[in-house]
């Protein structure tokens, strides 16, 4: 009732169905419409896309330097491109208006051809790459004021110190606290800390450093 389909016949039928007819769906990258050609060059939407980016038309200096650059490079093979550009710029400034005029005419002709070929062209200068932001977060507390806690007899007491002179005094206090002292040491520390806070509001850092070095904490025997 139903004929058995050979595998070779089935494969040939699939290939014949997938192959488009010649001339009916062929792709032609260039057309008579300059707008379509421009879209083809710029990736379909008129924007720059890699190697298909539309270049700006040459100005008078570029028209003149096109042959001059090749000439200078042949005469000085060891000269770098940046040095050649500087030399060409100096030579271009030394030319008279009459000597520059043929290159201005050629540049105008090239610009007219460019407008005819790419009517939707707009100059888009390349943006400079922005520096990447660091992932590290800035400290919430200023470096001039740091706060630490001192452990005295299993109790934490906040201790604030400013600048390097106060840090040195605080380190000496921590060393002295490490050797088991009476609990009234904490009271002395808190009183001295209150004194430092009151004096830091009206004294300069130099005066504060003098107070810290001249008045060490008193510890009862």
From Swiss-Prot:
An individual GO BP term: sex differentiation
Gene3D superfamilies, A to Z: High mobility group box domain
Gene Ontology molecular function: calmodulin binding; DNA-binding transcription activator activity, RNA polymerase II-specific; RNA polymerase II cis-regulatory region sequence-specific DNA binding
Compartments, as annotated in UniProt: Nucleus speckle; Cytoplasm; Nucleus
InterPro entries: HMG_box_dom, HMG_box_dom_sf, SRY, SRY-related_HMG-box_TF-like
Keywords per UniProt: Activator, Calmodulin-binding, Cytoplasm, Differentiation, DNA-binding, Nucleus, Sexual differentiation, Transcription, Transcription regulation
SMART domains: HMG (SM00398)
Top-level division of the source organism's lineage: Eukaryota
Region (Disordered): 24-53, 195-221
One of the record's GO cellular component terms: nuclear speck
Alphabetical list of Pfam families matching this protein: HMG_box
Known DNA-binding region: 54-122
Similarity comment: Belongs to the SRY family.
Subunit structure: Interacts with CALM, EP300, HDAC3, KPNB1, ZNF208 isoform KRAB-O, PARP1, SLC9A3R2 and WT1. The interaction with EP300 modulates its DNA-binding activity. The interaction with KPNB1 is sensitive to dissociation by Ran in the GTP-bound form. Interaction with PARP1 impaired its DNA-binding activity.
Protein task: Transcriptional regulator that controls a genetic switch in male development. It is necessary and sufficient for initiating male sex determination by directing the development of supporting cell precursors (pre-Sertoli cells) as Sertoli rather than granulosa cells. Involved in different aspects of gene regulation including promoter activation or repression. Binds to the DNA consensus sequence 5'-[AT]AACAA[AT]-3'. SRY HMG box recognizes DNA by partial intercalation in the minor groove and promotes DNA bending. Also involved in pre-mRNA splicing.
Protein name listed in UniProt: Sex-determining region Y protein
Organism: Cystophora cristata
Gene, per the UniProt record: SRY
